């Protein structure tokens, strides 16, 4: 079944913002450059930058479920499962496998970053199968890029998503409540049954509520879009009033999110960071949902700020940027790039090293992401499209006489 993928331009800007702040957090971990906007400190925003990963997960769930939500509203059949898996593989696997293998052969092996051959084999095998978050040495201590765990969690979710989404279409309340119950039960065990959370805070079970909120957001969006479509036929006042309200709500939600991030940044140690991250994950999910549901209906200046050719381009390379940036910034320090006077320039607060390192880290990561996207991912996607077209069965011949379909053959709406 062929499906037309819709785009919501404003979400390009939100995706770019989320991934930019996450990468800024990782770069800050290496540079310790205190971010200032004039006299206003952005330190809290960068220190809590890991929270925006939750926003990317919610955005993924929202976009994945949107065709199902539209089908629910229209009374149409669910999207084709084979097409779902093909699109995910086409989008993710070429760039991901290239980056993992490039880091393995170009950095990990030449720099002898593995302590033993069995560990090397285990690390590579688990990364190729997206199972590395299940093991401490391949998740926390891997030399193949610590940021790639997010994609592993997403791929695990993709494997289950069509089944869960069809369940939500049939019994939304029951299935969504089950997702929340499983997630909150697991999280309660983590928070009150454990004293260290590194191996549980970012497992798929701990993100089920974020996925569920994303699905609810998709259902709300199709209703809001239908209402906005009716309002667009009215007078200028009737069109602008909802847009102004959406803009105000967007700004209020963004302010609330910043307040939550400021609170998160006051965590006194790593254990408290992860405990708060789990406890307040639903609150952050609701904040991100507010941004997703208001941005597409806001006034034109805000919509153009978020949805424009620049954000569309950056959104297109964002996955490869995310996958590659953390490995690049760590390897830059191995190479002493840029050169520094002190052995630990980040601890010494060495300038201009901190500024130069930060700018170079952003620039190199962006450049390599563009190269991987346009030299590897897109050509591979075209090859996969041609391969899929060859495997597609030929269309059945049109019969010459009238055919009256039986009940099982009747066309579906």
Question: Model-flagged regions — what are they?
Answer:
Residues 63-70, 221-223, 294-295:
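Membrane-water interface of transmembrane alpha-helices
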Residues 180, 235-253:
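Signature aromatic-anchored transmembrane alpha helix within multi-pass, membrane-resident enzymes
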Residues 226-237:
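Flexible interhelical linker loops that connect adjacent transmembrane helices
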Residues 198-200, 204-222:
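Acidic, glycine-rich loop-and-beta core segments that form the ion-binding/anion-interacting portion
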Residues 79-80, 220, 227-228, 302:
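Cytosolic, membrane-interface loops and tails of multi-pass inner-membrane proteins
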Residues 22, 211, 215, 246-378:
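Alpha-helical transmembrane segments of multi-pass integral membrane proteins
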Residues 1-188, 192-195, 207, 230-232, ...:
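Membrane-cytosol interface segments of multi-pass membrane proteins
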Residues 45, 201, 236-240, 275-278, ...:
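Interfacial loop-to-helix junctions that mark the boundaries of transmembrane helices
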């Amino acid at each position: 079944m062929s499906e037309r993928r819709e785009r919501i331009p404003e979400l390009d800007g939100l995706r770019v913002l989320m991934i930019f702040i996450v990468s800024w957090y990782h770069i800050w971990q290496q540079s310790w450059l205190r971010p200032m906007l004039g006299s206003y400190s952005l330190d809290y925003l960068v220190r809590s930058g890991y929270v925006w990963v939750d926003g990317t997960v919610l955005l993924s769930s929202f976009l994945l479920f949107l065709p199902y939500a539209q089908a629910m509203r229209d009374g149409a059949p669910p999207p084709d499962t084979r097409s779902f898996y093909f699109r995910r593989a086409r989008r993710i696997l070429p760039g991901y496998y290239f980056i993992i293998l490039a880091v393995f052969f170009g950095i990990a092996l030449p720099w002898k970053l593995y302590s033993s051959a069995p560990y090397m084999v285990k690390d590579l095998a688990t990364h190729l199968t997206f199972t590395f978050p299940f093991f401490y040495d391949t998740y926390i201590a891997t030399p193949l890029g610590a940021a790639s765990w997010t994609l592993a969690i997403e791929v695990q979710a993709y494997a289950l998503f069509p089944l869960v989404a069809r369940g939500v279409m049939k019994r939304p309340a029951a299935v969504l409540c089950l997702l929340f119950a499983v997630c909150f039960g697991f999280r309660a065990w983590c928070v009150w049954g454990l004293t260290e959370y590194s191996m549980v805070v970012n497992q798929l079970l701990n993100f089920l509520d974020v996925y569920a909120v994303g699905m609810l957001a998709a259902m709300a969006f199709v209703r809001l879009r239908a209402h906005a479509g009716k309002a667009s036929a009215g007078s200028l006042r009737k069109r602008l009033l909802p847009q102004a309200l959406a803009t105000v709500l967007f700004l209020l939600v963004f302010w609330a999110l910043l307040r939550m991030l400021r609170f998160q940044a006051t965590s006194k140690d790593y254990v408290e960071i992860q405990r708060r991250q789990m406890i307040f994950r639903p609150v952050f999910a609701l904040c991100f949902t507010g941004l997703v549901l208001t941005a597409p209906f806001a006034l034109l200046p805000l919509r153009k700020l978020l949805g424009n050719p620049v954000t569309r381009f950056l959104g297109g390379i964002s996955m490869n940027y995310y996958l590659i940036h953390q490995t690049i910034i760590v390897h830059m320090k191995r190479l002493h790039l840029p050169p520094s006077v002190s052995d630990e320039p980040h601890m010494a607060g060495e300038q201009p090293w901190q500024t130069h390192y930060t700018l170079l880290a952003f620039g190199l990561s962006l450049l390599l992401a563009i190269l991987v996207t346009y030299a590897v991912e897109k050509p591979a996607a075209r090859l996969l499209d041609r391969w899929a077209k060859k495997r597609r069965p030929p269309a059945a011949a049109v019969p010459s006489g009238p055919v009256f379909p039986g009940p099982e053959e009747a066309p579906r709406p």
